[in-house]
UniProtKB/Swiss-Prot annotation:
Protein task: Transcription factor. Directly controls the expression of cytokine and chemokine genes in a wide variety of different cellular contexts.
MF GO annotations: DNA binding; DNA-binding transcription factor activity; DNA-binding transcription factor activity, RNA polymerase II-specific; sequence-specific DNA binding
Name under which the protein is recorded: Protein c-ets-1-A
Domain PNT: 49-134
Keyword Mitochondrion assigned: no
Length: 438
């Protein structure tokens, strides 16, 4: 296959109709930068939401559920699907000429060498999800009492799923695959779909309610899909379901992968906002079955941190790990890391607020890149690669470059609703002086 010369980062989520028209021969592969805080950024989470469509592809092509059982052709079909689904460019298919068992045995570091930056992260994330799902599928002893259709999900979900605001479920009819992309039914961007992920991958100490019984963490149930219209779909809609006459299991009704589309928003108005940053959980407890305890109460990130520890003057006001746990973004993302540095007084020599709202300056961009590389275990990270991730934020209305000022950027998403801080409050806490440099 002819390698693409244009490596400009691109990422798009195709609708189901576009997916049907997909031809492997028309496909080229690609380079995808960090995901964003509109719903979060780098590999975080609705990987399940977008990757769920691979279940249909597995059914169509007869690809085994367990990736360790894949042949060389299965591996190629999987990579081809991902390339088409995300409009990736820059992937060398020859590097993936191996069996599924060999692919899974590579380990993360070796696997990431097979694809360009960020593309490898996406593929690895999906491969891990597929392996976990196959284990759950093999160990489950629950047999559905209803006939499964061709597109009935093989996935499982746990009580550990984040809660979502729901509307009353429709009555169950024949299992049906939702043919419209989630993106076509809601004003949600592609990176929001990609930013959801397993709770099993989150820092357990940050996400689990200490009062929640451990026994609930390991309970899994099969998903029963229902016919859902756009009018009654919601983000990661959860409801009570029945399986073989047994009540009180949780099912996702809009899409088998919506178990990660449960990111909530700090206010109802933010549903209609183009600059949205999700809060971790802003829904009422009555939206959930009484058997499922909530992870935490409502509140901003400020409340979330205050409930867990007193602020230490020698530590960042906004630790990236805590912010990742609060938003449910999984791995720490670039925007979260930048906020950590910006709220750490010891880092003001190389990155700091300018004193003008959410604007900040990289006084030493190489040092920022070095620290980001150290945090992500990528020793080859440099400012050129870091800036590629920042540029990806421009079109997403997450971060903008300030015109006429070198290395100066501004958060343009709604950080105030997410964090619970106004910029002036953070500036005062950090003794920020207005930047007089032109």
């Amino acid at each position: 296959m002819k390698a693409a010369l244009d490596l400009k980062p691109t990422l798009s989520i195709k609708t189901e109709k576009e997916y049907e028209a997909y031809s492997c021969s028309d496909m080229e592969c690609a380079d995808v930068p960090l995901l964003t805080p509109s719903s979060k950024e780098m590999m975080s989470q609705a990987l399940r939401a977008t990757f769920s469509r691979f279940t249909k592809e597995q059914q169509r092509l007869g690809i085994p559920i367990d990736p360790r059982e894949w042949t060389d052709m299965h591996v190629r079909e999987w990579v081809s699907w991902a390339v088409n689904e995300f409009t990736l460019k820059g992937v060398d298919f020859q590097k993936f000429c191996m069996s599924g068992a060999a692919l899974c045995a590579l380990g993360k570091e070796c696997f990431l060498e097979l694809a360009p930056d960020f593309v490898g992260d996406i593929l690895w994330e999906h491969l891990e999800i597929l392996q976990k799902d196959s284990k759950q599928y093999q160990t489950s002893e629950i047999t559905p009492a209803y006939p499964e259709s061709r597109y009935t999900s093989d996935y499982f979900i746990s009580y550990g799923i984040e809660h979502a605001q729901c509307v009353p479920p429709s009555e169950f009819s024949e299992p049906s695959f939702i043919t419209e992309s989630y993106q076509t039914l809601h004003p949600i961007s592609s990176e929001e779909l990609l930013s959801l992920k397993y709770e099993n991958d989150y820092p357990l100490g940050l996400l689990r309610d200490p009062l929640q019984p451990e026994s609930l963490q390991g309970d899994y149930f099969t998903i029963k899909q229902e016919v859902v219209t756009p009018d009654n779909m919601c983000l990661g809609r959860i409801s009570r379901g029945k399986l073989g006459g047994q009540e009180s299991f949780e099912s996702i009704e809009s899409h088998d992968s919506c178990d990660r589309l449960t990111q909530s928003w700090s206010s109802q108005s933010s549903y209609n906002s183009l600059q949205r940053v999700p809060s971790y959980d802003s829904f009422d407890s009555e939206d959930y079955p009484p058997a499922m305890p909530s992870h935490k109460s409502k509140g901003t990130f400020k409340d979330y941190v205050r409930d867990r520890a007193e602020l230490n003057k020698d530590k960042p006001v906004i630790p990236a790990a805590a912010l990742a746990g609060y938003t449910g973004s999984g791995p720490i993302q670039l925007w979260q890391f930048l906020l950590e540095l910006l709220t750490d007084k010891s880092c003001q020599s190389f990155i700091s607020w300018t004193g003008d709202g959410w604007e900040f300056k990289l006084s030493d961009p190489d040092e920022v890149a070095r620290r980001w590389g150290k945090r992500k275990n990528k020793p080859k990270m440099n400012y050129e690669k870091l800036s590629r991730g920042l540029r990806y934020y421009y079109d997403k209305n997450i971060i903008h470059k300030t015109a006429g000022k070198r290395y100066v950027y501004r958060f343009v998403c709604d950080l105030q609703s997410l964090l619970g801080y106004v910029p002036e409050e953070l500036h005062a806490m950090l003794d920020v002086k207005p930047d007089t440099d032109e």
